[in-house]
């Protein structure tokens, strides 16, 4: 970390909770936010899209008493959010919150965003600590992701459902290239091609049970593959994380 004339103890603390998809980052961050009263920032490029609330897991994230902030409120019509631009937004938001809070919690699993953030560590005006959440055993992990996929495919309190979000985007040809790059969507598209299902009306047509089971399993498989990649990359990015006792906040994990 770059030298500063400000004593380290006087600099705001930003605690990053990172890890693979579906391992409980939001729950861990929410628990810490409740215990400390600190605001939370979601370091996720996909969760910026308000029209992907179910697919991105943004829906249902609001918790009473916890102040959660996203990097922006975009729609698919705005296009992709590049990693550098997302990191700019993250740094600006954290700096604004850190000006009035001694602790800011950041949670996320975007590889490109967190890699970019780490490359800027020497420029940051705050102390950055990191807690990496581990991967569970493979069978346990895939089972958890399968349950999550089932929830995403079921319209309800957490939004209209993944199939509805995909169908809505697919009806506009200009959105298809970006939609096909989204984890979850790509699995559904693969099944639509295999079973001759119309993507633009996938949310309105009856889907045979065995096909729906295959869609669910494939979404879980794709998310698991991405989770294994996240686990490997974050281990490299945050290599050497060690326990750090932070006055008033207990034991956290630190990146030197």
For every predicted segment, state its role:
Residues 26-104, 112-118:
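N-terminal phosphate/diphosphate-binding loop that engages ATP/GTP or pyrophosphate donors
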Residues 19-20, 107-111, 135-136:
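Structural motif
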Residues 1-9, 70-75:
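Extended, non-globular alpha-helical segments
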Residues 2-6, 98, 113-256:
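C-terminal accessory "lid"/substrate-recognition subdomains
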Residues 9-15, 101-102:
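Pre-Walker A (Motif I) flank of P-loop NTPase domains
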Residues 21, 82, 211, 215:
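Catalytic cores of large soluble enzymes that bind and process phosphate-bearing ligands
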Residues 14-32:
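Glycine-rich phosphate-binding P-loop
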Residues 15-17, 41, 69-71, 129-134:
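Hydrophobic/aromatic beta-strand patches that form the interior of the parallel beta-sheet core
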């Amino acid at each position: 970390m770059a030298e500063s004339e400000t004593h380290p103890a006087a600099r705001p603390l930003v605690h990053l909770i990172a890890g693979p998809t579906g391992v409980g980052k939001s729950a861990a961050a929410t628990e810490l936010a409740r215990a400390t009263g600190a605001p939370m920032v979601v370091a996720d490029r996909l969760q910026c899209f308000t029209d992907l609330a179910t697919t991105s897991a943004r829906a249902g994230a609001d918790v009473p008493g916890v102040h959660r902030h996203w990097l922006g409120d975009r729609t698919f019509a705005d296009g992709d959010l590049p990693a550098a631009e997302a990191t700019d937004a993250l740094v600006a938001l954290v700096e604004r919150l850190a000006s009035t809070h001694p602790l800011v919690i950041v949670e996320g699993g975007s590889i490109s965003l967190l890699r970019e953030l780490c490359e800027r560590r020497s420029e940051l005006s705050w102390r950055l600590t990191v807690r990496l959440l581990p991967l569970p055993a493979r069978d346990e992990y895939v089972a958890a992701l399968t349950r999550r996929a089932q929830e995403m495919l079921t319209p309800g309190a957490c939004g209209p459902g993944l199939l509805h979000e995909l169908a809505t985007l697919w009806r506009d040809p200009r959105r298809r290239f970006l939609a096909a790059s989204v984890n979850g969507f790509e699995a559904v598209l693969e099944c639509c091609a295999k079973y001759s299902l119309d993507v633009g009306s996938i949310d309105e047509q009856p889907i045979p049970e065995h096909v729906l089971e295959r869609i669910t399993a494939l979404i879980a498989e794709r998310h698991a593959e991405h989770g294994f990649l996240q686990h490997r990359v974050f281990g490299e990015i945050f290599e050497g994380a060690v326990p750090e006792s932070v006055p008033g906040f207990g034991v956290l994990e630190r990146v030197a």
